[in-house]
UniProtKB/Swiss-Prot annotation:
It is an enzyme of class 2 (transferase). NCBIfam families: PRK14830.1 (NF011405), uppS (TIGR00055). It comes from Staphylococcus epidermidis (strain ATCC 35984 / DSM 28319 / BCRC 17069 / CCUG 31568 / BM 3577 / RP62A). Catalyzes the condensation of isopentenyl diphosphate (IPP) with allylic pyrophosphates generating different type of terpenoids. Belongs to the UPP synthase family. Its EC number is 2.5.1.-. This is Isoprenyl transferase. Homodimer. Mg(2+) binds at D33, E220. HAMAP family: ISPT.
Length: 256
């Protein structure tokens, strides 16, 4: 549990924005919501909102890296998003190709590591190839780990992990008594990352939409009113300040 600093005058700051460097969340997850509404408000096609949302990803990735966040997980496309119009889905599927083509050199320079969670089944081969290329090029980087949740759903992830655990127990002749949280975590797509300390959702909606439903059990939640294309570095820092003003209890009692 993070402790509040008793002497604010001695609090060290980060990035010249009054952030306590001893209380930077290790893992920030973001539900990037509001691209369509952003475009609609401007009487533009929805794909324009997705394009501008991609530009926001670049800004937030740079800022997260500069601040010292270790893991940034972005909800890019859910298992439920396939129900959207085909033209919109096709455009979204091509975004990783364009994003990585233009941004990968900078990510490499900033020592950012690219990873993904989700299911490859159903993704276009061009999308898979772009993702795999970026992963290979950044696999040894040691700075920010940028995780894209693509064709991801929390329930589907848990179902997959349960099947894998069942098969493992069958193979080893073990019973259900060996199942614990650690075993489940080892079979989740996020097994190599810490659970998110902070989960942000933009657009003002207050739900998690099947995102990291196991991992976010003790996350701090912030629901930001900005639509994703309007979410910027200042908004991210404000969210971090709110996070730092809270005391995480993990089911325990406040120290006050």
């Amino acid at each position: 549990m993070f402790k509040k600093l008793k002497n604010k005058n001695k609090t060290e700051t980060n990035h010249n924005n009054d952030l306590d460097i001893h209380n930077i969340p290790e893992h920030v997850a973001i539900i990037m919501d509001g691209n369509g509404r952003w475009a609609k408000k401007r009487k533009m096609p929805r794909i324009k909102g997705h394009y501008e949302g991609m530009q926001t990803i670049k800004k937030i990735t740079r800022e997260a890296s500069d601040i010292g966040i270790k893991y940034l997980t972005l909800y890019a496309f859910s298992t439920e998003n396939w129900s959207r119009p085909e033209s919109e889905v096709n455009y979204i599927m091509n975004l990783p190709v364009n994003f990585l083509k233009t941004f990968l050199p900078e990510l490499i320079e900033k020592n950012v590591k690219i990873e993904t969670i989700g299911f490859y089944e159903g993704l276009p081969q061009s999308t898979i190839d772009a993702i795999d290329f970026a992963k290979a090029k950044t696999q040894h980087n040691t700075g920010l780990t940028l995780v894209f949740a693509i064709n991801y759903g929390g329930r589907a992830e848990i179902i997959q992990s349960m099947k894998a655990i069942y098969n493992e127990l069958q193979l080893n002749g073990q019973g259900s008594e060996v199942i614990d949280e650690a075993l489940i975590k080892r079979h989740l797509m996020t097994h190599s990352y810490p659970d998110p300390d902070l989960l942000i959702r933009t657009s003002g909606e207050q739900r998690i939409s099947n995102f990291l439903i196991w991992q976010a059990s003790y996350s701090e939640f912030i629901f930001n009113e900005k639509l994703w294309p309007d979410f910027d570095e200042k908004e991210l820092r404000e969210c971090l300040k709110i996070y730092q003003s809270r005391q995480r209890r993990f089911g325990g009692l406040s120290e006050e």
